[in-house]
Amino acid sequence: MTMNNPNLTMIARNWRDLIRPKGISIDAESGTQFYAKFTCEPLERGFGITIGNSLRRVLLSSLQGAAATAIRIEGALHEFTTVPDVVEDVSDIILNVKEVVFKAATPKTYSVRIDREGPGPVYARDIQLVEGLSVLNPDHLIAVLDKKGPLSMELTVNVGRGYVPAERNKTPTMPIGTIPIDALFSPIRKVNYTVQNARVGQVTDYDKLTLEVWTNGSVSPADAVAFAAKILKEQLSIWVNFEESEETSYQAVMSDDEPLNENLFRSVEELELSVRSANCLQNANITLIGELVQRTEQDMLKTKNFGRKSLKEIKEILANMGLSLGMKIDNWPQLLERWKAQQAQA
């Protein structure tokens, strides 16, 4: 279905008349590789919770990351055992390995090793990396050798999303002694959001959304939010059952067979508005109805002393004329001059 008839154009006002946020601001002072605070305003009442909660859930559940999914330690057949000359038992080593932050360039399976002799600590930087895989917390402790050792282990690293239990990481081709481990692939550590009142002109019942995002460093908070928004957009697009052939707008064309709406050239004084609304238009230097209809609701609400009551009044009067706020009139100055010239010749 294509939006190219008056009924669908009217329906389009369901979303085009809603106020849209000015943009997203990021707190530069507190922002790091791992944390950022985003602010988005103004939003329609209730949209702060709707958008904030949706982004939070997608951020926590649906972004891809890399994590260790299996480990094989020489001398250990299962996780409930110990390794000679190693302070930690196998269970503790596995817990430490799960906290290593990997970053993968491509979504595939990586196999890496650690071969270390003691005495001394074994860090994430001791992992013998392969092309396309990096470690973002190289100083993370994996184990401690209290004697000469050695400690030899092989790690399997995969790319995925969300939490995957150890049972699902087990494959039939795993060598004997390989221990599948549960993996948390998500690069997101924590997400918080708050909603406060926002002001547009004299109206204070809009929403201001503040979103805080913590990551493990494999993706920046800004990119993480962008990915989450893209996921939501892709999932919601299937619900739109029509296409817009072009941006729905009011094309003002002056011709003999299709005369322009004469109301556009009337003075706003003829609208017989309340004193408050009329004064607001006067303060905004709006003298003609054609100038008024080209203003959006957001523009009008930014006008001093202009509130929801005045907005409702103007919208109702314009609707009775077949007009509305937010119209686009091509070449308005030229059309106005042509109309004045025609009136002078009449």
Swiss-Prot record:
GO CC list: cytoplasm; DNA-directed RNA polymerase complex
Any Pfam family matching the protein: RNA_pol_L
Enzyme Commission code: 2.7.7.6
Domain notes: The N-terminal domain is essential for RNAP assembly and basal transcription, whereas the C-terminal domain is involved in interaction with transcriptional regulators and with upstream promoter elements.
Subunit structure, as described in the record: Homodimer. The RNAP catalytic core consists of 2 alpha, 1 beta, 1 beta' and 1 omega subunit. When a sigma factor is associated with the core the holoenzyme is formed, which can initiate transcription.
HAMAP family tied to this protein: RNApol_bact_RpoA (MF_00059)
Protein name: DNA-directed RNA polymerase subunit alpha
